[in-house]
Each structure stands twice: as C-alpha cells, then as structure tokens.
Amino acid sequence: MLAELGACLLLAMVLLDSDPGTQAMEGVKCGGVLSAPSGNFSSPNFPSLYPYNTECSWLIVVAEGSSVLLTFHAFDLEYHDTCGFDFLEIYNGASGDKGNLLGRFCGQVPPPPFTSSWHVMSVVFHSDKHVASRGFSAGYQKDVCGGVLTGLSGVLSSPEYPNNYPNNVECHWLIRASGPAAVKLVFVDFQVEGSDECMYDYVAVLGAPGPAHGHHYCGRTRPPTFVSLGHELQVVFKSDFNIGGRGFKAHYFSGECQEVFTAVRGNFSSPQYPGAYPNNIRCHWTIRLPPGYRVKVFILDLGLEEPNSLTRTCDFDHLAAFDGASEEAQLLGKWCGHHLPPPVTSSRNQVLLLLHTDRSTSGRGFSVAYIGVVPMNVSCSRTDFQILISAQALAPLERTKVYLGSRSCAAQEVGSNFRIQARFDTCGTESQRRNNTSVIVSVLYIDFSTAGHDDIHEYEVRCEPRRKEASAHLLSGSDLLGPYAATAEHLQEAPPGDEAEVLEGPGTMVTQDTSDIVFLGLCILAGVLMIIAIVVLMLL
C-alpha cells in the first residue's frame, strides 16, 4: 500500500513539474492532486459565483492499471462560441501536453462522462476578468469493472488481469466513438472458464453485425475482431461462483483512430494532424484492396517523438506497417522521428498501419498516401507490346478505361482479361536510350475517375527489343503523393511464371520472348542434320 502511494506521489510530482498546476488570484485556493479511489471537487466558491482571473488544475491519479471515470453534477460557466473566456479543459493524462486534450467546455451544458485510457486524468478551470457564473461540481472514481469509454483508443481487461479474475462479477463497458465513426475491438489475450455454450463465465459483445452480436465466448480461443455497425460497442463480462482464469485483455479503436480503406488510392493522417497527436493511444488503419493487388505506401510527412538516444530504435512513439491485416503479419517498416522513409510495397492486398504513442512527448504526427498496384502481365517481342490485366481486378471498369498512350489504343476484352496488343510505331511509344541500352517506352493509363473526381493511374511500360524483356513501373504523377509526385518508383519485379499465375499474383511482371531462341535452335539442328546427310552421301 505504501509502495503504491509512493508511486502515485512520485508520478504526481513528475506530471505537475511539467505544468504550473494551480495559478489563481491571491487568496483563492483550488486544484491539487487527487489520489483517493474516488472523490469530488468543484470550482472555487461553488455554488456561489467563481472569482475572476483564476486558473485551477486538478491531477487525478489512481492505481496503476485502472482508469478514471469523470462525471459532472453541475455546470455553469460563461458562454462563448469557442470557449475563449471562461472554460474547463479535460485531459487524458497531464495537462501540460496539449496532445492529451479531450475537450474544452463552457456554457450550461455539462460535459459528458469521460473515462481515461490510463490511470491519470487532469482537469483545468480558467476564468477571465469579466463575467462570473456558478461554476461546476464533478466527481471521479477508479473504474475497475465497466464504464463508458470515449477515447480514441484504449485497453479494457477483466478485473485483476493478468491475475485470475474474481468470482460473481458482472462488468459492462460501453465503447462510444465520436460522431458516426465505428468502433473496432481486438482481443489480444483470452482465458475464461470454458463450458458448452459458455453458460458459466463468458464475454459477450453487443453492437457487432451478424451472428457475432451477443454471442458468448469462453475458453482459450480469442474471439474475432469486432467492428461496430454504429458508433457503439457494448462488452459484457460475467463470472459465476467458482472456477476462474486469467481473464482477457482487449484493445479498442474508435473515430479517426481506426479506419478501413478500400479505394485503390487514398490518404490519411494521424489524429489532430498537423496539430499534436494525443498521448497514450494505439491506432489502426487497414488498407484492403481486391485480390491480386499490392499496396504501395508513401510517408508524406513524419513528425513523431525521436528514437531512443541509446539504442537509436523507435521504442517510444512510432508508426509501423504490417504486410497483412494484423500485427502478427510480417513487419514492413517501423518509423519515428522526422526522417522520411522510402515507400514500402506489400506482397499482398492488405496492409495494416499502426500508430503507438506513449504517455509523454507528442509531435505533429504523420501524413500517408497509398496506391494500389494493379496486377498485370507485360511482355514484348521485337515489334510490339502485349499487356494482360484480369478484368476482375479492375471491376467495374470498362475496357475503354484502360489504354496505352492514348484513348485510341484502348484494351480489348479477351475472355476474362483486358488485352492490349500494340506495335512499337503506335500508341505513343518512343525509343529512348537508358544505361547505354535502347528501350521502347510508352505509358499505360488506367482511369478510375468518378463523377467530379479525376483519378488516373499511370504505369510506364518498357521493352528492351534486343532481349525481348518487358516491365511496368508505377508513375507517381498525382498531388496526392506529395514529394514523390515527380518520381517514377520501380516496383519489385516478380519472377516470370505461368500466365494464369501471373494474373493472380503480384502486379508487375518481367517476361521474356523466347521465340527467337527456339527458332535459332531449330536452325542449328537443321544445319547439323544437313552436314550429316552430306557426309553419308560422300561415303556412299
């Protein structure tokens, strides 16, 4: 108990050291550190008028591993449309870091209940030199089982996790996103007493689509990932009178901290960008494209906490990309600081980007753009190009939206593919010399434009006629890609293979025409046979 109290006081001293704490007019006492499991506080003189020129700061610190539930009993502050005069600010952590700000409030409408994503919360009250009102009264409590969760992200777990949970408990959590955004829930650990139909101890999630809604989960198998139909998910945990387990731990993501992108091109940024991102959050962005596509991700701006000065690794705030739909997929890259990394390309049609921030130090965050790499097969002979793209990969585009050089060289639909067969003297092709090699170059256009929005993807198609080798390169010719807009990024070349496999696999192909080799081999064989015939005739 003394150790916990000492830790709380030490944490309070550290957090208060970064903030002036209580700054009120002479003679007014307010603010301070609240470390009891629950309590109440109010503006000076409440319910009478609060004084002018007052600033009070309360730091609420409860036991590590718990959260703080803050509710308001009364609220009456001078109104202003931007709360620029008298106001109350609520922080998810220390008030010295603006990235922790949950909201600024004034007027007579009380703030909603807030639950912190960790065991620290700050409240700041400010009044100017004009107009005073009754002020506010608020209460807080250490929230160990259930509650309303409104942050961008956070953690919920069974009571006393990772120790065994107690018997005869029932917890209800309501995870609420701001506005119309969805809520995502991911279980990272799960051990609950198992039974047929999970009749004894169980976890249930309400607000998800389909049969997952209200389904009971128990045992050791982690429940699936849930995404709400609306802007709320409810989680229920219940245990009976005997037999327990380690319980569960889950991460939730809401609002601008979790999104799924399915368009073939897009961009997104960290919460509050280019303002300071919040501390102590964990955000998921999933890019999910049709099968066969790969995803190329460009970091356009990066302003995160610097790496560890000793190890030079991103141990604190960082952005990470995974080659798949979960954090268990292969890591494509992990970044922090301010140095812009090169683009990364997935090996499949899904990418997960994760932003993790710790409890201190924030920056402006990041801005990201991505583009889907269309799966295609490109080959050439000494005289022409051939391009094959699965029509299913481009659905619902019409063939006229795919063309080489100009719209007059549009693709033809052949079976289940879009096909372009073009001679080198047509379709905008031109001869160039690169690295002392003569190449034929043209541009393939794929038009994803919709009404009022231009979106044309460009690929440079290149052939070395002498070697009959062809390749395709994504041209980043859009303002969406910022500093990469003027560059041509060479996509990873996949090994040549069967045509059917090519259309289902990675997008950029290098193929070689072997017809000349076969022809030369036949000529040599014919020559050898002719010499043998002549020798036989001479011997006769």
From Swiss-Prot:
Matching InterPro entries: CUB_dom, Sperma_CUB_dom_sf, ZP-N
Give the UniProt entry's GO cellular component terms.
Answer: membrane
Asked whether the keyword Ligase is assigned, the reply is no
Q: Which residues lie on this side of the membrane: Extracellular?
A: 25-516
What subcellular compartments does it reside in? Membrane
Q: How does it sit in the membrane?
A: Single-pass type I membrane protein
Residue limits of the CUB domain? 30-143, 145-255, 257-373
Signal peptide region: 1-24
**Transmembrane portions of the chain:** 517-537
Major location category of this protein: membrane
Pfam families associated with the record: CUB, ZP-N
Give the Cytoplasmic membrane side ranges.
538-540
Cited Gene3D superfamilies: Spermadhesin, CUB domain (2.60.120.290), Zona pellucida, ZP-N domain (2.60.40.3210)
Q: Which UniProt keywords apply?
A: Disulfide bond, Glycoprotein, Membrane, Repeat, Signal, Transmembrane, Transmembrane helix
Under PANTHER family, the record lists: CUB DOMAIN-CONTAINING PROTEIN 2, OVOCHYMASE-RELATED
Q: What is this protein called?
A: CUB domain-containing protein 2
